[in-house]
């Protein structure tokens, strides 16, 4: 384990919207250090969303992230030889990183032709409470609800 807690580094806002969450999404989507490719994809997806739905791409993005954020999750805890799935609340920073991760996983698994189309579709779906990322959040919440009896094992 670490001696000290790792310092949380501040990210700068992205070049167009000056939004830190968009920057985090761009960084998480980036493969092989190709940040410019990642930026092009996300901005093109925002344009595609505006084209399709008439809503601003950044607003749909923020709504999608908000809808995918988990409030509770389960953590494994061993008690006397048995492993229990204990429901715990999710801290805000983890809520954000999980929602970004789930949106990207769901986007990469979609069947549309280009990443731009996949990302745009997944963001619109998540904003409208459908899609794989939203389903993932619902599944996590169901697991926590099902294991509510073990909540007293929290740490």
Swiss-Prot record:
CDD domains: uS7_Bacteria. GO terms for cellular component: small ribosomal subunit. GO terms for molecular function: rRNA binding; structural constituent of ribosome; tRNA binding. The keyword rRNA-binding applies. GO terms for biological process: translation. PROSITE patterns: RIBOSOMAL_S7. Keywords: Ribonucleoprotein, Ribosomal protein, RNA-binding, rRNA-binding, tRNA-binding. InterPro entries: Ribosomal_uS7, Ribosomal_uS7_bac/org-type, Ribosomal_uS7_CS, Ribosomal_uS7_dom, Ribosomal_uS7_dom_sf. HAMAP family: Ribosomal_uS7_B. Part of the 30S ribosomal subunit. Contacts proteins S9 and S11. One of the primary rRNA binding proteins, it binds directly to 16S rRNA where it nucleates assembly of the head domain of the 30S subunit. Is located at the subunit interface close to the decoding center, probably blocks exit of the E-site tRNA. Belongs to the universal ribosomal protein uS7 family. This is Small ribosomal subunit protein uS7. It comes from Helicobacter hepaticus (strain ATCC 51449 / 3B1).
């Amino acid at each position: 384990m670490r001696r000290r807690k790792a310092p949380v580094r501040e990210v700068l806002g992205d070049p167009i919207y000056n939004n830190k969450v968009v920057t985090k999404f761009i960084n998480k989507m980036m493969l092989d250090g190709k940040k410019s490719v990642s930026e092009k994809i996300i901005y093109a997806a925002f344009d595609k969303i505006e084209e399709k739905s008439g809503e601003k791409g950044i607003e749909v993005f923020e709504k999608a992230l908000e809808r995918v954020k988990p409030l509770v999750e389960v953590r494994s805890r061993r008690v006397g030889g048995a492993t229990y799935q204990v429901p715990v609340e999710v801290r805000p920073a983890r809520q954000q990183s999980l929602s970004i991760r789930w949106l990207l996983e769901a986007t990469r698994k979609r069947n549309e032709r280009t990443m731009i189309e996949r990302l745009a579709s997944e963001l619109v779906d998540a904003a409208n409470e459908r899609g794989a990322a939203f389903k993932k959040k619902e599944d996590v919440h169901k697991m926590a609800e099902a294991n509510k009896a073990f909540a007293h094992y929290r740490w």
